[in-house]
């Protein structure tokens, strides 16, 4: 998962990474203005609101209920109402170009990101208005920063708003199951539930932190990033983005404004201390207060205590501090073990350790000063510089009254400290530098400060100073400032040389092995990029190629050292073959510890006493060379200089004792840099130090490939992907295969048996065995090889019995089309034929054609009159027309005089005449005769239209074929060539009987105009096309034309029904006669339909009952009406009754299912018998039963005789019920049809075979079955049923 943008808080827009910066900027601006105590009550509450607002943005669920906002928020200036796309543009505009910017709060945090943010007052506006936020904060009000999105209330804090929104339960439908909190969106509820369940799937790869949301992980990852390229020009603080820096700059601007205001108020009011809350009436008192209580923050404080980091302004204050705070402490000399009771004695004693001035020494600072100056930071920039000829140091200022100048008139040097991050270099003490680093450069990473004596790292400069003063006070040596010196001293022996080339040759020969060759060149070569020195040019070239990846860098030639020039301090490694030269002893020592561990010092021809002391395990001391002027015969003069420090000794014993001190220093116990614990060996130190850096984490290892995973889910996924194999199991032989191809080959070889099917070429029947085919040929084709099967109706012969049966079905088609010579055996087929071929959308007009006599006239009222005459004639012969399903009066047909096409509505005929013959409504007979005169000779056999040419007829025939019909009826699925014909067809689906009444409000409709107006009164909101529907049949209309056609159709039916009830036909009602007793009934549902010799007959319930009991053998004449009522018996139970009323009451009480037809007097022709009985049919043998118990007994007999298994003879598949077998045979019938199943009677399409089976059982009866068995009276809907029946029942 494109990813959804997280929503920002509604009222405040704080960009990522700067929420904490903004809060710090606000706090600093408030603190600069004098803190909260000097503010009004409204200011304090507003600041608390902003603090709450900034703190809420860092919570896990600060954006839960907020909706998605736009990708870019708009920043609006409150003075000129100009919009900006970013906070930086708005800040620049407010600072330089806004004409209305005043001294008020810029209100940069008041972003118009919510719809109501422009209408809500900012915190400064509330302050200016003097709002009272303390009254009813939780109840809310108007004009506050956090408005409710559901009502008009607003609140000063976001927490109050969240609590208030929970009362709108109707607007928050999603509820947390753990804490019952409500949410507006489901995604917010799901995000909140993760806080309860602890589902944190986003893990940080730097630490063990985990988060439930990816944006929280991104914010957390910024804490691991140390790059902050954007720095503040005021305080040098770094930021990760420009927006964070600009937001931070607002704090300086506010601070400046608050300071300006405080200065204005200071002229009128008291003076307040910037470091505490004390106020003073005069400036002198404030300065005295700062010097007394805050001396470390004063610019005049430059005297530092030698015991603690406090600084003081004058000497008297410093001495008073030492006597009060450090009176009981003994003051030790850092150079020797002597102790003194006063500081003055220590300073006087330190003069004895200073070396006298000579031509080969520069002026050395005080040893204590040297111990401070010898401390260096790990970074190259944090260094201490010694200024010659400057004022005395702060540590020497207490001795100004005793000895300020040396005997030779030279002043002591002053040590000053520089900041490694800015250009400020005038810090007089370490304490002042530390304060500067902690206040101005607090965002910088913490650096370690390394001691040059023991290489220990300290967190601060003050700790380094205390470390040198306490641990190395007996071995501290001053930093010497060398002047004009021309002698070069060897690091490993007391010899001195006049030039650097001689020194390098001496190191090669004497200290790099007995067989070492002297270098070819006489000069040293230095890299111009890193200033590293090399003895040969090839070594320098190789270094440039490897370290700086370049070949064109130029080298720095070795300077020619003259006796009058200054020296260059260099340190060479005695182990490297290219003899690199380092600029400091610290770099050389680190190089030896990293690259030459456990390597003893190189061979030397000198004695051990003349060599430098070396650490036994790791360290090799390579001290700074002592370059002294003069000859190399200083030892012969009786002076033994120490190459580790600047001391000289007059005899060899004292020199040897001094060297032992350096050796003990190098062989000291090694301390842990984390906890300062001492260890005897490096191994124990390393083992201990590993504990500080070791963290344990649980990993899950794969046993197969040894891969590690942080969670069990990752391991399981790896196992499923890499080490899981899918096996294929053969259920026939239980064999297992590792691939799909293998099991396919196995099934094809082992379990694929050939099975031959034998098909009869004459009738296309398939047989499993050759014997079955032989039996079939014997019975069907052996007797008469020629066409042995002859139709008894027409004499046509056929070669197979199946072909004869299919032909015989054409003779039983009792439904003839009145427009053409085609006949059909089902009503639904005739209706379909009329719709497709003759555009007739009602099939009720074929009543008069059942006997094969088509109508000879197309007049409007003739079919209805003929039907009325047949119904009114009491002496009419017994016929079956009145008992058919289509016995209703047919709709009036409108035929075209030119082409013979017939339509059910006059408007459809007019549309046809206009569309096909160009004859408009209302034209005279001359135009019609002219059109008839020009009628073509080519006639369409489908719709009887005529054309002048064969090409025109061919193009017309394309309209009757499938591909041209692009419009499908949504009700029945039938397709039509045009939208107009589809509209005309959809009207015929109307089943509404009350055609003149609105089905919504039951209001009668009289005309088409009233129908259209009434449809507009009941619009259909679900119809997105027109918004209307037919109020009579409730069909949805897609156009205004379709609505008008509906109106014409329903109003014509209304006119037809009113014409039938006119005085000419008043009192006439359609009656239905029983074919046996000729009794008349008002509804055709009162008659039971029977098929006798292929013709339908209607019998009443009484005649059906008597026929079932064997009482009636044929058609009996009607009983006389004046028969006495005595001797009436019940036809069901043969009980005698005295009157017809008693018999009728008995029939209704005891025989409710069947109402008998008694021989007593009838009340009239309008009495309606009871409905026909419900029957049950067996699927297996198609026998019919009257009640459910009988069919259950019958089915049980089938199960006892035949078993519960029913076999499909076409595929040999077994089923446990006949219904499932029938469904399976339906699937056989539609194999290869694309998964669709069409009803063979009404052509309704289904997607499942069982649905089609249910449809046939519910809609169609025995009379609708198509395929007849030639050997038994059973009928079937599908040919596969007939085949399966023949193969199972008549195979022998």
From Swiss-Prot:
Disulphide-bonded residues: none
Start-end of Polar residues biased regions: 110-125
Residue numbers carrying Phosphoserine: 55, 58, 612, 1062
InterPro entries per the UniProt record, alphabetical: Znf_C2H2_sf (IPR036236), Znf_C2H2_type (IPR013087)
Principal location listed in the UniProt entry: nucleus
GO molecular function: sequence-specific DNA binding; zinc ion binding
Expression sites (tissue/organ): Within the cerebellum, Zfp423 is expressed in both ventricular and external germinal zones. Transiently expressed in newly differentiating olfactory-receptor neurons.
SMART domains: ZnF_C2H2
Biased composition (Basic and acidic residues): 41-54, 1144-1155
The UniProt record lists the keyword Amino-acid biosynthesis: no
An annotated GO cellular component: nucleus
Biased composition (Basic residues): 1-11
Zinc fingers classed as C2H2-type: ranges: 75-101, 146-168, 174-196, 202-224, 230-252, 271-294, 303-326, 331-353, 417-441, 449-472, 488-511, 525-548, 571-596, 640-662, 670-692, 700-723, 728-751, 758-781, 789-811, 815-838, 894-916, 938-960, 967-989, 1028-1050, 1072-1090, 1128-1151, 1176-1198, 1206-1228, 1237-1260, 1267-1290
Disordered: annotated span: 1-21, 33-70, 95-125, 354-407, 598-635, 1144-1171
Biased composition (Low complexity): 371-385, 612-623
Record localization: Nucleus
Keywords: Activator, Developmental protein, Differentiation, DNA-binding, Metal-binding, Neurogenesis, Nucleus, Phosphoprotein, Repeat, Repressor, Transcription, Transcription regulation, Zinc, Zinc-finger
Database matches in Pfam families: zf-C2H2, zf-C2H2_6
BP-aspect Gene Ontology terms: brown fat cell differentiation; cerebellar granule cell precursor proliferation; cilium assembly; negative regulation of cold-induced thermogenesis; negative regulation of DNA-templated transcription; Notch signaling pathway; positive regulation of BMP signaling pathway; positive regulation of DNA-templated transcription
The record's note on its domains: Uses different DNA- and protein-binding zinc fingers to regulate the distinct BMP-Smad and Olf signaling pathways. C2H2-type zinc fingers 14-19 mediate the interaction with SMAD1 and SMAD4, while zinc fingers 28-30 mediate the interaction with EBF1. zinc fingers 2-8 bind the 5'-CCGCCC-3' DNA sequence in concert with EBF1, while zinc fingers 9-13 bind BMP target gene promoters in concert with SMADs.
PANTHER family per record: BLOODY FINGERS-RELATED, KRAB AND ZINC FINGER DOMAIN-CONTAINING
Other notes: Znf423 gene is a frequent target of retroviral integration in murine B-cell lymphomas.
Assembly and interaction partners: Homodimer. Interacts with SMAD1 and SMAD4. Interacts with EBF1. Interacts with PARP1. Interacts with CEP290.
Its biological purpose: Transcription factor that can both act as an activator or a repressor depending on the context. Plays a central role in BMP signaling and olfactory neurogenesis. Associates with SMADs in response to BMP2 leading to activate transcription of BMP target genes. Acts as a transcriptional repressor via its interaction with EBF1, a transcription factor involved in terminal olfactory receptor neurons differentiation; this interaction preventing EBF1 to bind DNA and activate olfactory-specific genes.
This protein's name: Zinc finger protein 423
The organism of origin for this protein: Mus musculus
Lineage: Eukaryota, Metazoa, Chordata, Craniata, Vertebrata
């Amino acid at each position: 998962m494109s990813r959804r943008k997280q929503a920002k808080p509604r009222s405040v827009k704080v960009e990522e990474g700067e929420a904490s910066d903004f809060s710090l900027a606000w706090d600093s601006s408030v603190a600069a203005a004098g803190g909260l105590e000097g503010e009004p009550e409204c200011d304090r509450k507003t600041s608390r609101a902003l603090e709450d607002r900034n703190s809420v943005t860092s919570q896990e669920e600060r954006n839960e209920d907020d909706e998605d906002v736009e990708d870019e928020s708009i920043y609006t200036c409150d003075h000129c109402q100009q919009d900006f796309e970013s906070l930086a543009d708005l800040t620049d505009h407010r600072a330089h170009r806004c004409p209305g910017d005043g001294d008020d709060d810029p209100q940069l945090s008041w972003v118009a990101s919510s719809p109501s943010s422009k209408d809500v007052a900012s915190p400064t506006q509330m302050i200016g208005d003097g709002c009272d936020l303390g009254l009813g904060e939780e109840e809310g009000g108007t004009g506050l920063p956090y408005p409710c999105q559901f009502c008009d209330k607003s609140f000063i804090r976001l927490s109050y708003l969240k609590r208030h929104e929970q009362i709108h339960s109707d607007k928050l439908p999603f509820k947390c199951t753990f804490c019952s909190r409500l949410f507006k969106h489901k995604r917010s509820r799901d995000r909140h539930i993760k806080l309860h369940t602890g589902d944190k799937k986003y893990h940080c790869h730097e630490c063990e932190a985990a988060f439930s949301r990816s944006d929280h992980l991104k914010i957390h990852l910024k804490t691991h990033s140390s790059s902050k390229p954007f720095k503040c020009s005021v305080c040098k603080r770094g930021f990760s983005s420009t927006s964070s820096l600009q937001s931070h700059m607002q704090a300086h601007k506010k601070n400046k404004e608050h300071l300006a205001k405080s200065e204005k108020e200071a002229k009128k009011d008291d003076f307040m201390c910037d470091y505490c809350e004390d106020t003073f009436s005069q400036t002198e008192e404030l300065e005295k207060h700062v010097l007394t209580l805050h001396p470390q923050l004063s610019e005049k404080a430059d005297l530092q205590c030698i015991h603690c980091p406090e600084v003081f302004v004058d000497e008297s204050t410093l001495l008073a501090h030492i006597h009060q705070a450090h009176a009981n402490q003994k003051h030790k000399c850092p150079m020797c073990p002597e102790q003194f009771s006063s500081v003055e004695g220590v300073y006087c004693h330190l003069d004895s350790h200073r070396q006298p001035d000579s031509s080969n020494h520069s002026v050395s600072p005080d040893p204590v000063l040297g111990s401070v100056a010898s401390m260096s930071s790990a970074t190259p920039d944090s260094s201490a510089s010694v200024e010659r000829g400057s004022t005395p140091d702060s540590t020497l200022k207490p001795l100004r009254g005793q000895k300020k100048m040396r005997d030779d008139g030279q002043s002591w040097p002053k040590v000053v400290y520089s900041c490694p991050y800015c250009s400020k270099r005038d810090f007089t003490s370490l304490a002042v530098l530390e304060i500067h680093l902690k206040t101005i450069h607090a965002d910088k990473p913490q650096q370690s400060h390394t001691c040059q004596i023991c290489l220990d790292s300290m967190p601060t400069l003050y700790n380094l100073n205390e470390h040198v003063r306490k641990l190395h006070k007996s071995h501290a040596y001053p930093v010497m400032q060398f002047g004009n010196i021309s002698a070069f001293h060897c690091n490993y022996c007391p010899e001195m040389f006049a030039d650097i080339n001689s020194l390098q040759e001496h190191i090669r020969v004497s200290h790099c092995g007995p067989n070492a060759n002297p270098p070819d060149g006489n000069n040293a070569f230095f890299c111009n990029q890193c200033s590293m020195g090399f003895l040969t040019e090839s070594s320098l070239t190789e270094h440039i190629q490897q370290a700086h990846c370049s070949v064109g860098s130029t080298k720095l030639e070795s300077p020619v050292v003259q006796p009058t020039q200054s020296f260059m301090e260099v340190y060479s490694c005695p182990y490297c073959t290219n003899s690199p030269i380092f600029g400091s002893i610290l770099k050389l020592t680190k190089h030896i510890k990293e690259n030459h561990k456990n390597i003893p010092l190189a061979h030397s021809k000198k004695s051990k006493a003349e060599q430098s002391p070396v650490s036994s395990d790791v360290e090799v001391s390579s001290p700074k060379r002592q370059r002294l002027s003069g000859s190399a015969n200083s030892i012969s003069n009786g002076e033994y200089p120490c190459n580790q420090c600047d001391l000289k000794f007059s005899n060899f014993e004292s020199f040897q004792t001094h060297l032992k001190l350096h050796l003990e220093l190098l062989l000291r116990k090694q301390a842990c840099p984390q906890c300062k614990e001492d260890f005897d060996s490096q191994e124990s130190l390393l083992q201990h130090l590993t504990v500080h850096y070791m963290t344990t984490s649980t990993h899950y290892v794969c046993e197969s490939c040894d891969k590690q995973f942080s969670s069990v889910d990752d391991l399981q996924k790896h196992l499923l992907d890499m080490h899981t194999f899918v096996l294929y199991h053969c259920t026939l032989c239980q064999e297992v295969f590792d691939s799909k191809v293998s099991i396919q080959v196995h099934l094809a070889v082992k379990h694929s048996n050939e099975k031959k099917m034998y098909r009869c070429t004459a009738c296309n029947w398939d047989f499993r065995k050759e014997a079955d085919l032989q039996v079939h040929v014997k019975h069907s084709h052996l007797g008469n090889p020629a066409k042995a099967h002859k139709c008894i109706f027409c004499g046509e012969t056929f070669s197979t019995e199946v072909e004869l049966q299919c032909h015989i079905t054409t003779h039983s088609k009792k439904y003839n089309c009145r427009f053409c010579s085609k006949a059909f055996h089902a009503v639904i087929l005739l209706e379909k034929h009329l719709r497709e071929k003759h555009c007739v959308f009602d099939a009720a007009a074929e009543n008069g054609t059942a006997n094969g006599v088509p109508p000879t006239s197309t007049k409007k009222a003739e079919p209805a009159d003929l039907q009325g005459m047949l119904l009114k004639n009491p002496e009419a012969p017994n016929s079956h027309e009145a008992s058919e399903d289509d016995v209703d009066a047919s709709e009036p047909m409108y035929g075209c005089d030119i082409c013979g096409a017939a339509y059910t509505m006059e408007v459809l005929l007019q549309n046809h005449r206009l569309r096909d013959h160009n004859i408009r409504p209302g034209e005279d007979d001359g135009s019609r005769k002219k059109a008839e005169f020009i009628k073509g000779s080519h006639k369409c056999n489908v719709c009887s239209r005529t054309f002048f040419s064969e090409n025109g007829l061919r193009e017309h025939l394309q309209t009757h074929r499938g591909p041209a019909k692009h419009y499908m009826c949504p009700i029945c699925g039938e397709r039509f060539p045009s939208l107009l014909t589809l509209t005309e067809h959809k009207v015929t689906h109307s089943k509404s009987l009350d055609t003149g009444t609105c089905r919504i409000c039951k209001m009668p409709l009289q005309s088409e105009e009233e129908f259209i107006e009434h449809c507009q009164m009941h619009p259909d909101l679900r119809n997105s096309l027109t918004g209307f529907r037919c109020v009579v049949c409730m069909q949805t209309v897609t156009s205004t034309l379709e609505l008008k056609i509906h109106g014409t159709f329903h109003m014509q039916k209304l006119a037809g029904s009113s014409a039938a009830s006119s005085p000419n036909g008043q009192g006439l009602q359609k009656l239905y006669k029983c074919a046996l007793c000729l009794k008349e009934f008002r509804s055709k549902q009162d008659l039971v339909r029977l098929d006798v010799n292929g013709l339908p007959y209607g019998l009443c319930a009484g005649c059906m009952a008597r026929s079932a009991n064997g009482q009636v053998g044929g058609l009996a004449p009607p009983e006389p009406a004046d028969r006495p009522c005595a001797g009436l018996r019940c036809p069901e139970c043969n009980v005698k009754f005295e009157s017809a009323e008693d018999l009728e009451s008995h029939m209704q009480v005891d025989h409710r299912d069947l109402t008998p037809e008694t021989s007593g007097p009838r009340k009239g022709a309008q009495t309606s018998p009871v409905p026909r009985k419900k029957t049950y049919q067996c699927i297996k043998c198609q026998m019919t039963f009257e009640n459910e118990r009988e069919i259950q007994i019958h089915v049980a007999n089938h199960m006892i005789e035949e078993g519960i298994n029913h076999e499909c003879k076409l595929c040999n598949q077994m089923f446990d019920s006949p219904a499932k077998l029938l469904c399976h045979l339906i699937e056989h019938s539609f194999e290869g049809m694309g998964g669709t199943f069409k009803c063979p009677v009404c052509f309704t399409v289904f997607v499942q075979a069982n649905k089609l089976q249910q449809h046939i059982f519910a809609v169609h009866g025995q009379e609708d079955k198509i395929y007849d068995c030639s050997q038994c009276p059973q009928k079937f809907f599908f040919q596969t049923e007939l085949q399966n029946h023949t193969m199972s029942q008549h195979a022998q």
